[in-house]
A protein has these predicted regions:
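Membrane-anchoring hydrophobic helices of lipid-metabolizing enzymes
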Residues: 2-14, 18, 22-103
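Soluble catalytic domains of membrane acyltransferases
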Residues: 84-162
Length: 162
């Protein structure tokens, strides 16, 4: 979704700038192409800059008991965008087996650091409580967002905490 918005915005700005520059010759056709790529990269950088600014507004020392829907939504759409940019091909089967009328616990075995991003995006409509290692809560941009989305911190090295 976000990728399509960025592409549409970049295309609209490219067309507008090309129209204002009055590009009419075929030998100048490279200008809109370079403009489109530059504007697209600029829009993505602007998005992450805004995300960074929003992360500064979150009090990481405070304990939250309910996740904020806005910040949880930002986490989900950013995960979607990262999955799309990584060109991750995901085939999901068995979603109908996930219970909808009772509480349950899912334990994911992941081989890479990217797997939880995809898993969280795929199960975004489920009312899940996510767990994460304590070092993820200290990450500069993602840390405040996962804290405000009420992820649980579990130290895997300490058996008593796990």
């Amino acid at each position: 979704m976000l990728k399509k918005i960025f592409l549409g915005l970049s295309l609209a700005l490219t067309v507008l700038i090309s129209f204002l520059m009055k590009i009419t010759l075929w030998k100048e056709i490279w200008i809109p192409i370079v403009l489109f790529i530059g504007i697209y990269i600029g829009v993505v950088i602007l998005y992450f800059f805004i995300i960074w600014l929003l992360s500064l507004t979150i009090d990481t020392k405070k304990e939250y008991d309910k996740p904020n829907k806005f910040y949880a939504w930002l986490v989900v759409i950013t995960m979607e965008m990262l999955s799309n940019y990584a060109r991750a091909k995901v085939k999901v089967t068995g979603m109908e087996k996930i219970p909808t009328n009772q509480k349950y616990m899912l334990v994911f075995n992941h081989r890479s650091k990217f797997d939880p991003i995809i898993q969280s995006y795929i199960l975004r409509k489920s009312n899940l409580v996510h767990i994460s290692k304590p070092s993820n809560f200290k990450a500069p941009i993602a840390g405040p967002f996962i804290k405000r989305s009420c992820y649980l911190s579990i130290d895997r090295d300490n058996a008593r905490n796990g």
